[in-house]
Design a protein with these regions (language model features):
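PLP-dependent amino-acid enzyme catalytic core
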Residues: 12-323
Length: 323
């Protein structure tokens, strides 16, 4: 994994020229084939129930190694096509890490400068990857989480609007549209009989975009959103919406059910998935899987699908203590 990111950095450093608007658009379009198209795997060892199947989408099998490649690509592409983002502007946003890595990977390939605001307690691995990709990092209070990072990004953008394109992933409709146009169709093509979709809430883009498209395909599909059980949790990237700033793209009407996941349960899944499913999961991926298992265990029949946003490579500090 580290080799992958260093390879991206080497590519980035070789881009020293400015492109015409048409060339820039062509280059961003050429990256489309590297985003999405991720495999669905059946979870068959740690969950077994007659009549019920559980599948998980391995989102690290794409550019930048996480589900956030989808939203980052959609946001950047639309901004370039609409003339809001050029090589003369700085791409700016708040992130807990993965969106930033996706932004920095794509921006680097397009020779677009990037500044990211993220909480100071983001994992060491994430910070090192972001810096290796050429991103300027502005660290914000760990106690304010991504809410504090958003506020800092907003202040920076307001201080010099002409210098920045503020992507604002928590407000940008291209976040959820990325999943509406890619994640959901991939699931439908692979598993047209899906009965339940389960996903955690962070920016909420994955749940909102995928959920909307699935409901259009089949209104009987049940959508289950997941949150941490408390504001003080260890699920990096997830939001406890009762105590955090609710993203503007969130649609509270979508979910048929809302479930909570304990951090400790996610850590248990990290261990069992590694031992029995040969899956090296991040805390948020394990939390999604924990929530999906919780749902699947209540069913007599059905096909349950969840998302594995990324693997454990960027969380060695945490995972080495768990395994």
């Amino acid at each position: 994994m580290w080799g992958f990111f260093h390879a991206e950095r080497s590519t980035m450093e070789s881009l020293t020229t400015y492109f015409s608007e048409n060339i820039l658009i062509q280059r961003i379009k050429s990256l489309e084939r590297k985003v999405g198209h991720t495999p669905l795997v059946r979870i068959s060892k740690i969950f077994q129930r007659k009549g019920v199947s559980l599948y998980a989408k391995k989102e690290w099998a794409q550019l930048s190694g996480s589900v956030k490649a989808r939203a980052a690509y959609q946001i950047i592409r639309r901004a370039i096509e609409e003339g809001e983002l050029t090589q003369q502007k700085i791409l700016l946003d708040a992130t807990s890490g993965n969106t930033g890595i996706a932004y920095a990977t794509i921006a680097g390939l397009l020779n677009i400068p990037i500044t990211l605001c993220l909480p100071e307690n983001a994992s060491k691995e994430r910070k090192e990857i972001l810096e290796s990709l050429g991103a300027k990092l502005i660290l914000t209070s760990r106690f304010e989480g991504t809410d504090g990072a958003q506020e800092r990004a907003r202040q920076i953008s307001n201080s010099d609007p002409s210098a920045y394109f503020y992507a604002d992933q928590y407000k940008n409709d291209n976040n959820w549209k990325a999943h509406y146009f890619s994640t959901a169709p991939e699931i439908i093509d692979a598993l047209p009989g899906i009965t339940h979709f389960v996903a955690g809430l962070g920016t909420t883009g994955t749940f909102v975009g995928t959920g909307r498209r699935l409901k259009e395909f089949n209104p009987d599909i049940k959508l289950i959103s997941l949150q941490p059980d408390t504001a003080l949790h260890g699920l990096e990237g997830w939001k406890h919406l009762e105590t955090a700033k609710v993203p503007q793209i969130f649609d509270s009407r979508l979910a048929d059910e809302n479930h909570e996941v304990k951090t400790e349960k996610a850590y248990e899944i990290i261990r069992s998935a590694w031992k029995h499913e040969d899956l090296y999961l991040s805390p948020s991926s394990a939390a999604n899987l924990a929530g999906a298992i919780q749902v699947a265990q209540t069913l007599k029949e059905g096909i349950v699908v969840t998302i594995l946003p990324d693997n454990g490579d960027k969380y060695a500090e945490i995972i080495n203590k768990i395994l």
